[in-house]
């Protein structure tokens, strides 16, 4: 697992208060991890801060799973 993947999973587990083992790449923030729309906005902000990058709104709307976040950040993180 990449360093980015590990960091994303840790951020998600901490922000959503879920067990780390539930945070898999296929896990949907809303359907599987119990996030609401505000949680997803806060996660995007946490990713931006942790990875020192900007996630445009149109890209943020496509980040629905842990794997989506990892793929985006692997391509775009500083």
Swiss-Prot record:
<dbReference type="GO" id="GO:0016020">
    <property type="term" value="C:membrane"/>
</dbReference>
<feature type="modified residue" description="O-(pantetheine 4'-phosphoryl)serine">
    <location>
        <position position="37"/>
    </location>
</feature>
<comment type="function">
    <text>Carrier of the growing fatty acid chain in fatty acid biosynthesis.</text>
</comment>
<keyword id="KW-0596">Phosphopantetheine</keyword>
<keyword id="KW-0275">Fatty acid biosynthesis</keyword>
<dbReference type="GO" id="GO:0000035">
    <property type="term" value="F:acyl binding"/>
</dbReference>
<dbReference type="GO" id="GO:0000036">
    <property type="term" value="F:acyl carrier activity"/>
</dbReference>
<dbReference type="InterPro" id="IPR009081">
    <property type="entry name" value="PP-bd_ACP"/>
</dbReference>
<feature type="domain" description="Carrier">
    <location>
        <begin position="2"/>
        <end position="77"/>
    </location>
</feature>
<comment type="pathway">
    <text>Lipid metabolism; fatty acid biosynthesis.</text>
</comment>
<dbReference type="GO" id="GO:0005829">
    <property type="term" value="C:cytosol"/>
</dbReference>
<dbReference type="GO" id="GO:0009245">
    <property type="term" value="P:lipid A biosynthetic process"/>
</dbReference>
<keyword id="KW-0276">Fatty acid metabolism</keyword>
<comment type="similarity">
    <text>Belongs to the acyl carrier protein (ACP) family.</text>
</comment>
<keyword id="KW-0597">Phosphoprotein</keyword>
<dbReference type="InterPro" id="IPR036736">
    <property type="entry name" value="ACP-like_sf"/>
</dbReference>
<keyword id="KW-0963">Cytoplasm</keyword>
<keyword id="KW-0443">Lipid metabolism</keyword>
<dbReference type="Pfam" id="PF00550">
    <property type="entry name" value="PP-binding"/>
</dbReference>
<dbReference type="InterPro" id="IPR006162">
    <property type="entry name" value="Ppantetheine_attach_site"/>
</dbReference>
<keyword id="KW-0444">Lipid biosynthesis</keyword>
<protein>
    <recommendedName>
        <fullName>Acyl carrier protein</fullName>
    </recommendedName>
</protein>
<dbReference type="InterPro" id="IPR003231">
    <property type="entry name" value="ACP"/>
</dbReference>
């Amino acid at each position: 697992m990449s360093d980015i993947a590990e960091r994303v999973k840790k951020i998600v587990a901490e922000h959503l208060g879920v067990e780390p083992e539930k945070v898999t790449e296929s896990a949907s923030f809303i359907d599987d991890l119990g996030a609401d729309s505000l949680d997803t906005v806060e996660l995007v902000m946490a990713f931006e801060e942790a990875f020192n990058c900007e996630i445009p709104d149109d890209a943020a709307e496509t980040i629905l799973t842990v794997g989506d976040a990892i793929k985006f950040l692997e391509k775009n993180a500083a």
